């Protein structure tokens, strides 16, 4: 799988994805993640990506040209690289010199080595937007397709020219009913949730199915050593070795927690 992220602040999206399980997945060749500076596709010498809105309003709107040219460039040719963490906020040079911009973008996966993952697959374009459909585990699983390709667009300022949404974007995704300063953080959340569901990313194949929401319930309580701490003891059933009883206990506790914390996840007849 290959994921390209387009942002004015690529380091914000890239940094968390270079760590932990997602970073290891890239090193192992399970996914290739590239963060690009949208200004590399701006047309003027100032590398402008925003302008005042028609009709009058507060703030600035992101221009359509950089998005179209960036996505078409990434779709139509093998992308050179993704923005390296140390260079993400230090992009210089001519805005019209695409090759110069491309020479600065480096693969985040493993020491700059280009990974042939999803490069030839049709790219689906996702816009991170508070106006999008609410992101959940079901949508994460929908996008976690080995060998597929995603291009993730990050908004900023007051929004994006509607022509980008109408004619370039395949899906709008919101990570919640709140507004961030830019879409790079949302892109990192989206990418992490998707990539961890790819086969081989998590060490235990059962880890993802046991996650909260995967079964429609919140996750059951977890315990580890010591058996007793400050008078609080691990439930005896978890020490019994009876796998059937343990499974029943876990499902019951998951159901109880879901009823208490997120009853909206349950059918009407199971909320009481």
Name each model feature, range by range:
Residues 1, 106, 117, 216, ...:
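SAM-dependent methyltransferases
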Residues 1-77, 243-267:
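N-terminal nucleotide/polyanion-binding subdomain common to many enzyme families
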Residues 4-6, 34-36, 124-126, 150-152, ...:
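Hydrophobic/aromatic beta-strand patches that form the interior of the parallel beta-sheet core
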Residues 20-24, 141-145, 168:
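Short, solvent-exposed amphipathic alpha-helical segments in soluble enzyme
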Residues 63-90, 96-98, 104-107, 112-156:
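S-adenosyl-L-methionine/SAH cofactor-binding core of RNA-modifying enzymes
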Residues 160, 164-211:
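Structured adenosyl-cofactor binding patch, chiefly the S-adenosyl-L-methionine
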Residues 185, 197-236:
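Internal, active-site/partner-interface "lid" segment
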């Amino acid at each position: 799988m290959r994921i390209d992220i387009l942002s004015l602040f690529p380091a914000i999206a890239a940094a968390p994805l270079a760590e932990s399980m997602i970073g290891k997945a890239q090193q192992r060749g399970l996914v290739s993640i590239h963060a690009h500076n949208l200004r590399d596709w701006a047309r003027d010498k100032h590398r402008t990506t925003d302008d005042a809105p028609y009709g009058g309003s507060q703030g600035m709107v992101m221009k359509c040209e950089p998005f179209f040219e960036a996505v078409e460039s990434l779709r139509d040719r093998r992308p050179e690289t993704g923005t390296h963490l140390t260079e993400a906020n230090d992009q210089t040079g001519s805005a019209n010199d695409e090759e110069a911009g491309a020479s600065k973008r480096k693969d985040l996966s493993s020491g700059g080595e280009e990974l042939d993952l999803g490069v030839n697959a049709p790219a689906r374009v996702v816009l991170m937007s508070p106006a999008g459909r609410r992101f959940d585990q079901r949508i994460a699983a929908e996008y976690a397709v080995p060998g597929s390709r995603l291009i993730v667009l990050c908004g900023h300022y007051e929004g994006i020219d509607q022509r980008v949404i109408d004619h370039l974007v395949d899906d709008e995704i919101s990570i919640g009913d709140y507004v961030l300063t830019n879409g790079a953080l949302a892109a990192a959340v989206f990418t992490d949730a998707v990539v961890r569901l790819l086969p081989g990313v998590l060490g235990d194949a059962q880890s993802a199915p046991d996650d909260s929401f995967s079964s429609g319930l919140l996750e059951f309580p977890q315990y580890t050593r010591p058996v007793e701490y400050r008078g609080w003891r691990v439930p005896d059933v978890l020490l019994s070795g009876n796998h059937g009883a343990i499974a029943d206990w876990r499902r019951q506790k998951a159901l109880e927690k879901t009823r208490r914390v997120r009853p909206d996840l349950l059918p009407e007849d199971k909320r009481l």
